[in-house]
């Protein structure tokens, strides 16, 4: 890392760090919006492929930070600490005008705190789930950030209650996904039959998620197909690596099950489907915005679940339910993830009218559609302006 400090009067430097694909999407949208007012700005830190395509300079590969769960993080802790120290030293030496940590809170908030102490303005984009567990983290966030950018309205209310600066910007997915999704067109593009029911199998984007969920997903699919031989299964995968893992587990657990794998077209698969059997995460919000019924499952590693459950204060864990404050979609967690529970829930959503659910999904969409990248850029520039004002005093 020999990049020279180019923070001159002519060039504004925005430092950013993202840890996974959803953050890469947010970062790319933010870069695009910031470039409208700062066309010659420099963007540097850790970014993903979408950010790199916009000229972002990444000091480490994004995959360095793509870990989830206490056990998984502990296995990589030395490397993560090395990366964070290297970034801290780099940004203190080569001071950016503002640092924006995008999600990855356990990594970014510690980094933001070290930078803010050195006089660097910091923004955290995507609130950690402090409203759900480890609520006292909000005091560290208050010390570490000049502004939190929240994607969800109930998050801002939580920060306001604790007098921590926060701006609700809306969710970029709500801007990108059309209000009405076209099932016929999606099936045409994917070459899928128009006259059959389709269930999407979506066991997550991380290797650990696939290994913990797929056995129950495959067994549920077998039972569903035994009851409806015309039922089709499609599985969207975000990478060849995940597709290979999926195929290996399928060969072991369900060699006779016919499943169409589609790479890098998750939203298209959702739109083409009648129901989704999915892991928890941002994908459940995508499903709601595409207006598709879903059954949500999640399994933590046993140790992670044991260590974390005492800190969790949630009635629900999926975004559609949290946003509506009710059991809008079914959730299954840990031992409840089993074919005995999955099969009847999927059947109900495949074969019964879902128009009332669709109305609720539309209300969510309208609430979150705010031109998020533009709102986020405005908030970042407000923080930058406050820095310039304080420097000129």
Curated annotation (Swiss-Prot):
Keywords in alphabetical order: Glycosyltransferase, Lipid A biosynthesis, Lipid biosynthesis, Lipid metabolism, Transferase
Gene Ontology BP term (one): lipid A biosynthetic process
InterPro entries from the UniProt entry: Glyco_trans_19 (IPR003835)
Enzyme Commission numbers on file: 2.4.1.182
Family statement drawn from the similarity comment of this UniProt entry: Belongs to the LpxB family.
Pathway stated in the Swiss-Prot or TrEMBL entry: Bacterial outer membrane biogenesis; LPS lipid A biosynthesis
Keyword Glycosyltransferase: yes
Catalytic activity, as annotated: a lipid X + a UDP-2-N,3-O-bis[(3R)-3-hydroxyacyl]-alpha-D-glucosamine = a lipid A disaccharide + UDP + H(+)
MF-aspect GO terms: lipid-A-disaccharide synthase activity; phospholipid binding
UniProt key word Iron: no
One GO CC annotation: membrane
Coiled coil: none
The protein's role, per its UniProt record: Condensation of UDP-2,3-diacylglucosamine and 2,3-diacylglucosamine-1-phosphate to form lipid A disaccharide, a precursor of lipid A, a phosphorylated glycolipid that anchors the lipopolysaccharide to the outer membrane of the cell.
Protein name per its UniProtKB record: Lipid-A-disaccharide synthase
């Amino acid at each position: 890392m020999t990049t020279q400090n180019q923070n001159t009067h002519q060039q504004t430097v925005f430092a950013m760090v993202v840890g996974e694909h959803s953050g890469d999407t947010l970062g790319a949208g933010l870069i695009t919006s910031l470039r409208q007012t700062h066309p010659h700005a420099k963007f540097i830190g850790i970014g993903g492929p979408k950010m790199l395509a916009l000229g972002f300079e990444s000091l480490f590969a994004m995959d360095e930070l793509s870990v989830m769960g206490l056990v998984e993080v502990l296995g990589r802790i030395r490397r993560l600490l090395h990366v964070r120290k290297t970034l801290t030293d780099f940004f203190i030496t080569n001071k950016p005008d503002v640092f924006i940590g995008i999600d990855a809170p356990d990594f970014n908030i510690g980094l933001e705190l070290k930078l803010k102490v050195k006089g660097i303005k910091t923004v955290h984009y995507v609130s950690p789930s402090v409203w759900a567990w480890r609520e006292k983290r909000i005091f560290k966030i208050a010390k570490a950030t000049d502004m939190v950018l929240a994607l969800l309205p109930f998050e801002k209310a939580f920060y306001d209650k604790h007098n921590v600066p926060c701006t609700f910007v809306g969710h970029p997915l709500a801007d990108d996904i059309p209000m009405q999704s076209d099932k016929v067109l999606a099936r045409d593009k994917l070459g899928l039959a128009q006259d059959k029911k389709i269930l999407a199998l979506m066991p997550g984007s991380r290797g650990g998620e696939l290994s913990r969920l797929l056995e129950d997903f495959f067994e549920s699919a077998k039972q569903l197909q035994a009851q409806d031989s015309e039922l089709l299964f499609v599985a969207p995968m975000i990478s060849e690596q995940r597709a290979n893992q999926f195929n290996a587990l399928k060969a072991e657990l369900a060699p006779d099950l016919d499943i169409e794998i589609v790479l890098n077209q998750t939203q298209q698969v959702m739109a083409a489907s009648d129901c989704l059997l999915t892991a928890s995460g941002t994908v459940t919000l995508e499903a709601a915005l595409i207006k598709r019924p879903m059954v949500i499952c999640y399994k933590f590693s046993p140790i992670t679940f044991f260590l974390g459950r005492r800190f969790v204060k949630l009635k629900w864990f999926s975004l559609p339910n949290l946003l509506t404050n009710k059991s809008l979609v079914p959730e299954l967690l840990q031992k409840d993830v089993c074919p005995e529970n999955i099969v009847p829930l999927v059947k109900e959503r495949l074969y019964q009218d879902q128009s009332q659910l669709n109305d609720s999904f539309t209300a969510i969409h309208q609430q979150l559609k705010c031109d998020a990248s533009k709102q986020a850029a405005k908030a970042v520039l407000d923080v930058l302006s406050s820095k310039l004002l304080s420097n000129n005093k």
